[in-house]
Regions:
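Membrane-interface helix/helix-cap signal primarily in integral membrane proteins
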Residues: 1-79, 366-369, 374-384, 390, ...
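Aromatic-rich juxtamembrane segments at the membrane interface
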Residues: 10-136, 141, 393, 458, ...
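Hydrophobic alpha-helical transmembrane segments in multi-pass membrane proteins
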Residues: 17, 68-230, 287-330, 423
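Membrane-interface amphipathic/re-entrant loop segments adjacent to transmembrane helices
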Residues: 24, 29, 74, 219-235, ...
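Divalent metal-coordination and catalytic microenvironments
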Residues: 56, 84, 125, 175, ...
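Active-site environment of divalent metal-dependent phosphoester hydrolases
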Residues: 88, 127-131, 363-364, 399-404, ...
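Core dinuclear metal-dependent hydrolase active-site scaffold
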Residues: 162-172, 276-393, 438-510, 515-518
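Active-site HxH/HxHxD metal-binding segment of metal-dependent hydrolases
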Residues: 401-438
Length: 519
């Protein structure tokens, strides 16, 4: 799951403060900051295309539509919309040609290019992707300027160590890992696609190598892989590199091109969203251990070495290994209490069967709109990291928001076989959920006595119906791995007493207390 603290460390943020009041004391008179603000304000002139100007020139993609960003990530093309070596090379090429046109010699062009890159790093707030690409470009320029004859791979390794010294937590930045690893393999095995082959084949090979290298990073961070991304890149790489990017830079200078750029952006987004609507190429893969990651990189390194020699048969072994990883399960028998903040969610797994009790859900306060299901950041990544694609039983202890609201999200993102409700009348939330279940043809039941799953029984302890939803909670008793579990939902003291009077369960090993322990 997403580790906010580790993310902040990777961005060189080591503490968080709350500002109670703010007062403008004076303007920053620094020349560089003034120029930076002027350049950013220039981008605001392009009203329609500003999000992409901001993303592809200044490295800030916070203005991009979240659904579009999700489609880019799902299609495996998000790297094209973060500043990378391609963007730096185009910018540097434009600047280099400009210096040549006004009569600067080779040596002066190199020095001014270094200053340009240093200022560009400052302009983009020293973002991780810009730092990596710019430091590498500066290393290549210095290598050429002083004729050091250092290989590009060694320049990249030197760049890596510089970034580690500046911020060791860069290793936790996914973009940095993508950038360094893919660049390393593309440079090290550049003979694979530097031969006399067609542009389409060269683009495919670059995408193929990039996909294989990025596979473990994708799996261990997103737990899903789109196997069509190699082919999607055949369209998006040339389109973004040779059409969209040049228009972004040109429109920044010539504002009247904004309408054309906006049309290209819409085309790009529509195609990405259309492709993202197809789910068949997306495979959920459970998290890879360090052992499997090491073995994987050894295998693909051997494969690339053989491809350099023109031998392609080893690719079949790589594909078989990836297929094995995709169907490998990391689902031990057990009970996991998932942290969903204010709410409940419990995962029970045995004999490859999956039972999810409650889904959590964010409580709404006042007019605050409910937008982001907590299950998206907690339950979904956790289940996917275990390779879970299907939930055999989704048990709703009762219809309170903090137990059942994200059930809508769960049934939208997982194959759910059956849903179990508690006794008593359905509340409004449960009625809405039932409408969704009917549309998806998902079976649902209520007020059941027990579930028998592969000779493991979950007993639903019934003591009659109550006047409040909390005491009508499904109370579940089960034995797993030699331990006795009791899940109380939001049941209060009255129902606890009734259960103890009716059932002999005083020797429970693990008790999930009712109503989060507050009643």
């Amino acid at each position: 799951t997403f580790n906010y603290k580790r993310y902040l460390y990777s961005e060189k943020v080591y503490s968080v403060i709350k500002i109670s009041s703010m007062e403008k004391v004076s303007d920053n008179k620094n020349l560089f900051y003034g120029l930076k603000n002027l350049l950013i304000k220039r981008g605001l002139c392009l009203n329609k295309s500003y999000p992409y100007i901001n993303s592809l020139i200044f490295g800030d993609n916070s203005y991009l539509d979240s659904d579009v960003v999700l489609s880019y990530r799902g299609n495996g093309i998000s790297h094209l919309f973060a500043i990378s070596g391609t963007h730096i090379n185009i910018l540097l090429g434009i600047f280099y040609v400009f210096l040549k046109k006004i009569g600067f010699g080779e040596r002066k062009r190199c020095f001014f290019s270094i200053f340009f890159l240093l200022f560009y790093m400052f302009l983009t707030g020293f973002s991780m992707s810009v730092l990596r690409a710019s430091i590498f470009a500066i290393g290549i320029i210095i290598n050429k300027l002083f004729n050091f004859k250092v290989s590009s791979v060694n320049v990249l390794i030197f760049c890596f160590f510089i970034m580690m010294m500046v911020n060791p937590f860069s290793l936790f930045n996914i973009g940095f890992l993508f950038s360094i690893l893919i660049s390393f393999y593309l440079i090290l095995f550049s003979d694979i696609f530097n031969r006399d082959i067609s542009f389409v084949r060269k683009t495919f090979l670059v995408s193929y190598v990039s996909f294989l290298v990025s596979f473990p990073i994708l799996v261990n961070n997103f737990y899903q892989v789109n196997f069509m991304s190699v082919f999607y890149n055949l369209f998006f790489v040339p389109f973004v590199s040779f059409v969209l990017l040049p228009f972004v830079f040109a429109s920044y200078v010539f504002v009247f091109l904004d309408d054309i750029l906006y049309f290209l952006i819409l085309l790009n987004e529509k195609v990405s969203l259309f492709l993202y609507s197809f789910t068949f190429p997306v495979v959920t893969v459970c998290k890879m251990s360090v052992f499997f990651i090491v073995v994987y990189f050894i295998v693909i390194s051997i494969n690339f070495k053989m491809m350099k020699r023109g031998k392609v048969w080893f690719n079949f072994i790589v594909i078989l290994f990836i297929v094995f990883l995709c169907f490998r399960s990391n689902l031990p028998n057990g009970v996991t209490f998932i942290d969903v903040s204010q709410g409940d969610s419990t995962l029970i797994t045995f004999n490859k069967k999956v039972v999810l009790i409650d889904t959590g859900g964010v409580l709404s306060y006042g007019d605050k709109e409910y937008k982001y299901p907590i299950a998206n950041n907690r339950i979904l990544p956790f289940l996917r990291s275990k390779g879970i694609k299907r939930i055999n039983y989704l048990v709703i202890s009762h219809g309170d928001v903090d137990h059942a609201r994200d059930a809508f999200f769960i049934v939208d993102n997982f194959k759910v076989d059956r849903v179990i409700f508690n006794c008593g009348a359905y509340n409004d939330l449960e009625k809405e959920l039932i409408k969704v279940l009917n549309k998806k043809n998902i079976e649902y039941y209520s007020c059941i006595k027990e579930l028998n799953i592969d000779n493991n029984k979950l007993y639903f302890l019934y003591t009659g119906e109550y006047d409040n939803e909390n005491d009508n909670s499904n109370v579940i008793y089960t034995k797993l791995g030699g331990y006795k579990f009791l899940f109380m939902g939001d049941a209060g003291a009255d129902k606890e007493k009734d259960i103890l009077d009716k059932y002999n369960i005083s020797d429970v090993d693990v008790l999930k207390v009712g109503h989060h322990g507050s009643r």
